[in-house]
Amino acid sequence: MKENFWSELPRPFFILAPMEDVTDIVFRHVVSEAARPDVFFTEFTNTESFCHPEGIHSVRGRLTFSEDEQPMVAHIWGDKPEQFRETSIQLAKMGFKGIDLNMGCPVANVAKKGKGSGLILRPDVAAEIIQATKAGGLPVSVKTRLGYYEIDEWKDWLKHVFEQDIANLSIHLRTRKEMSKVDAHWELIEAIKNLRDEIAPNTLLTINGDIPDRKTGLELAEKYGIDGVMIGRGIFHNPFAFEKEPREHTSKELLDLLRLHLSLFNKYEKDEIRQFKSLRRFFKIYVRGIRGASELRHQLMNTQSIAEARALLDEFEAQMDEDVKIEL
């Protein structure tokens, strides 16, 4: 194996969760500007497309990263071990520091085809995939859920995953069936850690689910002794979620992050052509807590270009009464 960056991380370490159509190079740089985590994962990259001579062009932009983001982990999904083997070899050549396997995506057209969380029901295939991915020489990690249908599935499923000798397990503390409709099962963290200690003491354990910020993550790490904390949806509520010393933030800071997001979208669109409308999911992160925020969000949702969005921001900020402190 090439150098295992996981062993060099602080304890606990913090990771921005991989999120489809969210954690591209643009948003990762915005998060870095606000308060960066210790590790970044890419968006989801399909191994079948990556291995296809034509499909590679449709996914290459998902793997775009810059050296200042290191350690960078490629998050990949599929169900054909040989494709994982081939992909892992190429990812190592591209400069990634690790590979993370998606065994937790709950989306129906993924899971019901035996991919993502569907691999929970195919443990033998999951094991083959893990071993095949080691061909690239990078440390292999897994992101998964407690089970597919029932919470109690975690015992057999996670035991099986721990037996595969992986670098890190990120466990989303819900089942596939639960999606994100119920509270994450923090009450299971201690038992999962005990299982890890028994089966694979050298595998790092990262928890995920309902963790809004670094402060909460530190409290959980102190209580349970886990190695890492992964924050996903919490970043939408607080782009400063990874801040080491929390402080008050203002509406101007959030709007400045939006301007940065727009600029980076322009900069990197040559690497992966994305329609402008893909930006709309982010506006609610930056525009809130000030007079006129609702109307500005509505107007931004109807813009068709970076130039239009910037013009709206210029007009809005010129009329702002004051820089308001924001509750995050």
UniProtKB/Swiss-Prot annotation:
FMN binds at P18, M19, E20, K143, N208, G209, D210, G232, R233. The keyword RNA-binding applies. Pfam families: Dus. It comes from the Bacteria. It catalyses: a 5,6-dihydrouridine in tRNA + NAD(+) = a uridine in tRNA + NADH + H(+); a 5,6-dihydrouridine in tRNA + NADP(+) = a uridine in tRNA + NADPH + H(+). The active site is at C105. Keywords: Flavoprotein, FMN, NADP, Oxidoreductase, RNA-binding, tRNA processing, tRNA-binding. One of its GO terms (molecular function) is flavin adenine dinucleotide binding. Its EC number is 1.3.1.-. SUPFAM superfamilies: FMN-linked oxidoreductases. Its cofactor is FMN. InterPro entries: Aldolase_TIM, DUS-like_FMN-bd, DUS_fam, tRNA-dHydroUridine_Synthase_C, tRNA_hU_synthase_CS. PANTHER family: DUS-LIKE FMN-BINDING DOMAIN-CONTAINING PROTEIN (PTHR11082:SF25), TRNA-DIHYDROURIDINE SYNTHASE (PTHR11082). Catalyzes the synthesis of 5,6-dihydrouridine (D), a modified base found in the D-loop of most tRNAs, via the reduction of the C5-C6 double bond in target uridines. Belongs to the Dus family. This is Probable tRNA-dihydrouridine synthase.
